[in-house]
């Protein structure tokens, strides 16, 4: 039976992934922005500012600031909910989908072994 990955291995994959994100061309995402991005892309929607704030246990203004940045980078967009005009829906974008695909590749390379992740392989945004 194969041994399960240790906490240190998970931390190593996280480090290699973050290093690759920092080294790539283009802007960085903060931890909060990345958390909002991943929540929108990995969990089924629809997503709202209110729902994201509750899911991540942060304030609605903090979610709004993160979405402002994700919108500037075309990684997510906001749209008024036609069913409830007081609510704003967060939508995925093609550029965000490509970023997630690249991020998965970087994480896979990092998980395969130390120093195997290509630092510049994520596209800049």
Residue ranges and their predicted role:
Residues 1-28, 125:
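N-terminal leader segment of winged-helix/HTH proteins
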Residues 16, 35-38, 65-71:
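Generic structural signal for well-ordered, non-membrane alpha-helices
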Residues 17, 21, 101-125:
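Amphipathic alpha-helical dimerization/coiled-coil segments
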Residues 19-58:
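N-terminal helix-turn-helix DNA-binding core of bacterial DNA-binding proteins
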Residues 46-88:
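Canonical helix-turn-helix DNA-binding module
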Residues 82-103:
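Basic, amphipathic "hinge/linker" alpha-helix immediately C-terminal to the N-terminal HTH DNA-binding motif
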């Amino acid at each position: 039976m194969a041994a399960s990955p240790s906490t240190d291995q998970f931390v190593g994959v996280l480090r290699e992934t973050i290093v690759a994100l920092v080294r790539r061309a283009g802007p960085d995402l903060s931890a909060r922005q990345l958390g909002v991005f991943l929540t929108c892309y990995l969990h089924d929607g629809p997503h709202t500012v209110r729902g994201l704030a509750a899911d991540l246990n942060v304030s609605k203004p903090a979610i709004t600031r993160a979405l402002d940045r994700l919108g500037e980078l075309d990684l997510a967009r906001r749209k008024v909910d036609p069913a409830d005009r007081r609510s704003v829906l967060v939508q995925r974008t093609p550029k965000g989908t490509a970023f997630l695909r690249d991020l998965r590749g970087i994480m896979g390379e990092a998980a395969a072994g130390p120093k195997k992740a290509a630092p510049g392989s994520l596209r800049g945004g």
